[in-house]
């Protein structure tokens, strides 16, 4: 079979895996309330808002997912070199990373909540721990497995010269950064502050004054994940999937058109710059259109 067709198929599969991983990563952070929005959850009891959110800001998402995917990639790489099937090796590595993820989540939830119990009266809800840890580990496993699979495809079928553990680390940091900057806005700026008028941002005076009641009953992290699965999660997946797909596409295009290595590299760089320029132009057009259409925010 034509090597170009194999590369295109591997790129399509890697892009699809990256899309799933981005969505799962964002929804996992919504269930556990990690990254930027967690500062508001942490401030809640200090503002008198006793809540039932799962409070587990282990670290920023880029650092934590860099760790999880690097663990999975390293174990998978070792098992593949030992002769195990690649898919099984990735599953085993992702399973170990899920255990690490769960251990950090439990310790972070208990530690951060107990630290606020005596002074601010925030209880440690054990049912919140037991009901949330499953979705956290489950979403995390899906995210880590698909990211490790995309990294494996990059190192085998797409010609990435770096070893699997290093590519997995880079992919983990990347998806964590995208989830923190893209999907978490839907959770932190909207879901946590639905009692305030939409579009007003989060003034300093409102920080920590989060919603503690849901449409029915008391709100928790599972409610946040359900809400964000309709926009924030898919948007994060689309963003990460496009990054992986377009980055691989420019390299394949350079290999098809170019002759020597310098020409291939130059074409790939030019296509990459063109993609960035087009994306920036579309973003600018959308922002200007939205501002002209809806005008400035008014309370």
Curated annotation (Swiss-Prot):
The similarity comment for this entry is: Belongs to the MtrE family.
In which organism is this protein found? Methanococcus maripaludis (strain C5 / ATCC BAA-1333)
One Gene Ontology cellular component annotation held by this UniProt entry = plasma membrane
One GO biological process term is: one-carbon metabolic process
Name the chain's protein.
Tetrahydromethanopterin S-methyltransferase subunit E
Residue stretches spanning the membrane: 57-79, 95-115, 133-153, 158-178, 237-257, 262-282
Subunit arrangement?
The complex is composed of 8 subunits; MtrA, MtrB, MtrC, MtrD, MtrE, MtrF, MtrG and MtrH.
- Indicate where this protein resides in the cell: Cell membrane
């Amino acid at each position: 079979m034509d090597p170009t067709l194999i590369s295109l198929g591997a790129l399509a599969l890697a892009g699809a895996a990256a899309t799933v991983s981005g969505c799962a990563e964002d929804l996992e952070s919504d269930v556990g309330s990690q990254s930027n929005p967690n500062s508001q959850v942490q401030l809640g009891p200090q503002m008198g808002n006793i809540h039932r959110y799962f409070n587990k800001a282990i670290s920023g998402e880029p650092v934590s997912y860099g760790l999880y995917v690097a663990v999975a990639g390293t174990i998978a790489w070792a098992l593949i070199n030992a002769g195990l099937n690649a898919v099984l090796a990735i599953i085993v590595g992702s399973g170990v990373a899920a255990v690490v993820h769960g251990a950090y989540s439990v310790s972070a939830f208990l530690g951060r909540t107990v630290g606020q119990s005596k002074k601010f009266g925030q209880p440690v809800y054990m049912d919140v721990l037991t009901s949330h840890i499953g979705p956290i580990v489950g979403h995390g496993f899906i995210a880590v497995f698909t990211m490790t699979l995309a990294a494996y495809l990059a190192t085998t079928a797409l010609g990435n010269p770096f070893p699997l553990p290093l590519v997995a680390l880079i992919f983990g940091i990347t998806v964590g950064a995208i989830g923190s900057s893209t999907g978490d806005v839907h959770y932190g700026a909207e879901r946590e502050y639905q009692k305030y008028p939409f579009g007003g941002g989060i003034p300093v005076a409102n920080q920590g004054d989060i919603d503690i009641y849901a449409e029915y009953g008391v709100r928790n992290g599972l409610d946040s994940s359900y809400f964000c699965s309709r926009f924030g999660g898919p948007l994060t997946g689309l963003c990460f999937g496009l990054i992986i797909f377009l980055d691989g596409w420019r390299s394949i295009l350079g290999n098809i058109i170019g002759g020597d290595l310098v020409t291939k590299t130059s074409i790939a760089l030019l296509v990459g710059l063109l993609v960035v320029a087009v994306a920036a132009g579309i973003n600018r057009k959308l922002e200007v259109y939205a501002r002209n259409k809806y005008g400035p925010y008014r309370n």
